[in-house]
């Protein structure tokens, strides 16, 4: 979003502070699709592609930011070229009702890229990127397994990653 300053939203607002969900129309969905493909697209470019005025596109993008639909803008990174030759999904079983404290500890980990509380055979799915296998081993054995609420872990090495393109 290079040509205007858009609303900034704290990365981690509490759920009770979030505005109610507003329905998205086809123009909103088109804007999201375009920004997902190119988060650096200018408001003017977005407006032209969805056939609305620049002011309308600006207002819509700002609303999507304020409502928390757009959580931010980021770059897609080739982890290997960035010096992270090893990626892994780590599954964790944790003590019941400890998600919030475990989440805060996992956020501090170097290379943690994504985490989710899930249902099934394990409780947490964590994606990490590390320099090499030794760094991954150290991360799992000395950092993650040292968290008192973590009961067990299982590490799944990633052999190849593919970013999915936005829907047409």
Model-derived segments and their meaning:
Residues 1-168:
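A compositional/biophysical signature of low hydrophobicity enriched in polar/charged and small residues
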């Amino acid at each position: 979003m290079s040509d205007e300053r858009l609303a900034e939203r704290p990365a981690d607002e509490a759920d009770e502070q979030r505005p109610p969900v507003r329905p998205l129309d086809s123009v909103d969905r088109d804007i999201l699709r375009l920004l997902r493909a190119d988060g650096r697209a200018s408001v003017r470019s977005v407006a032209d592609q969805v056939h609305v005025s620049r002011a309308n596109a600006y207002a819509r993008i700002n609303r999507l930011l304020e409502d928390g639909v757009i959580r931010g803008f980021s770059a897609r990174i080739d982890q290997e070229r960035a010096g992270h030759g090893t990626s892994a999904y780590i599954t964790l079983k944790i003590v019941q009702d400890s998600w919030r404290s475990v989440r805060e500890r996992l956020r501090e980990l170097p290379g943690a890229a994504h985490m989710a509380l899930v249902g099934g055979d394990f409780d947490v799915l964590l994606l990490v990127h590390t320099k090499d296998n030794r760094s991954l081993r150290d991360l799992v054995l000395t950092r993650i397994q040292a968290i008192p609420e973590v009961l067990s872990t299982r590490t799944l090495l990633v052999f190849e990653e593919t970013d999915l393109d936005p829907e047409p």
